[in-house]
């Protein structure tokens, strides 16, 4: 199978990071003063973000030492005490993982990348500083997508993608808090521990499994509707990320009455499962550039589930070869078919353009 080793590494790395983030979520919330930092853009970042990024990048480097990584976080400005907290959480997670969830013949560390010291942690985090680009292959990582949801005790996701020559070829998303019965579906046995993992390789379909197992994979597909009035939208919780007022205007124009609001790329997973039909993320300002790690893993999962993923104004595919950001404006993903997706995008474009009319 194409990218077989890469898929194994991505799945097990996301799985282990999902376990850690689920385990420490309540602790991070209870001790925000010591576990959470505010970045320069006023967004929060937690011990969990850094620990998850460290686990995943170390797994990548241990198996593909020459591969580059575009990661969201940097170790710049972190105190030794904070980095020590990251390492301690990783060690505590190792004990739980090795006892209950370890898979044979998989290495998260090796002699070159032992992950034992504070300097090891800093080095691994900063391997995520690659700028991306049009040529070659690199991994794209958001260790906790939806940090504000994580800090509310709600939905978040661990997201990893492999991009080759500007095209996402593999995506893996861990959703540690996802309970499908909350969205009208039946849950799979074993989801209670730490949710689900969704994954896809381009050309090979999209699948999901309880994270506790990650061996029994069920193929998934979007649902196709004939009328926008029957659609359910997927939207974020935070108003700082997308224009909720304009998204409401789009829904009114298309006679869409049902919406689900949740953080993170878990929205892409619900779309791929056929539990909703269109993901709206309209830019608050046209100058805003989406980060590739917020959409890369979801891109290939939606595509392989039969969906469509474009910008919100010109109806063009998202370009993941532009560096660390997308050049296009806004994001819309839908279950299709093409004519309905085009209608949603054209309506979105009209609404966005009317703000300056």
Curated annotation (Swiss-Prot):
Expression induction: By salt stress.
Cofactor(s) the protein requires to work: Mg(2+)
Effect upon mutating residue 61 to M: In strain: Montrache
Active site: 49 (proton acceptor), 147 (proton acceptor)
Binding site for Mg(2+) 1: 72, 142, 144
Keywords of the record: Cytoplasm, Hydrolase, Lithium, Magnesium, Metal-binding, Nucleus, Stress response
Enzyme Commission (EC) number: 3.1.3.7
Subcellular location: Cytoplasm; Nucleus
Substitution effect: residue 63 to S: In strain: Montrache
Positions bound to Mg(2+) 2: 142, 145, 294
GO cellular component: cytoplasm; nucleus
Reactions mediated catalytically: 3'-phosphoadenylyl sulfate + H2O = adenosine 5'-phosphosulfate + phosphate; adenosine 3',5'-bisphosphate + H2O = AMP + phosphate; adenosine 2',5'-bisphosphate + H2O = AMP + phosphate
Pfam family, one: Inositol_P
Cofactor note: Binds 3 Mg(2+) ions per subunit.
GO biological process, one term: methionine biosynthetic process
Effect listed in the UniProt record for changing residue 308 to V: In strain: Montrache
Residues binding adenosine 3',5'-bisphosphate: 147, 241, 264, 267, 281, 294
Binding residues for AMP: 241, 264, 267, 281, 294
Keyword Nucleus carried by entry: yes
A GO molecular-function descriptor: 3'(2'),5'-bisphosphate nucleotidase activity
Database matches in Gene3D superfamilies: 3.40.190.80, Fructose-1,6-Bisphosphatase, subunit A, domain 1 (3.30.540.10)
Additional record remark: Present with 7330 molecules/cell in log phase SD medium.
Function: Phosphatase that converts adenosine 3'-phosphate 5'-phosphosulfate (PAPS) to adenosine 5'-phosphosulfate (APS) and 3'(2')-phosphoadenosine 5'-phosphate (PAP) to AMP. May regulate the flux of sulfur in the sulfur-activation pathway by converting PAPS to APS. Involved in salt tolerance. Confers resistance to lithium. Shows no activity on inositol mono- and diphosphates, 3'-AMP, AMP, nicotinamide adenine dinucleotide phosphate (NADP), and p-nitrophenylphosphate.
NCBIfam families assigned to the protein according to its UniProt record, in alphabetical order: bisphos_HAL2
Stated family: Belongs to the inositol monophosphatase superfamily.
Protein name: 3'(2'),5'-bisphosphate nucleotidase
Native source species: Saccharomyces cerevisiae (strain ATCC 204508 / S288c) (Baker's yeast)
Gene label: MET22
